[in-house]
Amino acid sequence: CVKSIYSYYVPSSTDWSIQDACKGFFPNVFVDIEGACAEKKYKALSCYRTELRDAPHPRSIESIQILDKACGIHVGLKSAECFMLHRRIV
């Protein structure tokens, strides 16, 4: 049984949606990914060569690293993955 439903930020895709209170991405869950976890993320992303572009494109490794640092800043971490919790059953 699914207990929680989250969405995540997709660089250069999420930005094109209409940003209002009913739609849009407003993160409220942050996961610390500093260090080895972040490196695994970037290594995994590099496997998707057709999806990545050169900086300053939002889907470049460099831009994604900057986004991760910006997400971390919001919650006092060096690097974070941000999610939006839509529903949780407790």
Language model region names:
Residues 1-90:
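Metal-dependent de-N-acetylase/amidase catalytic core
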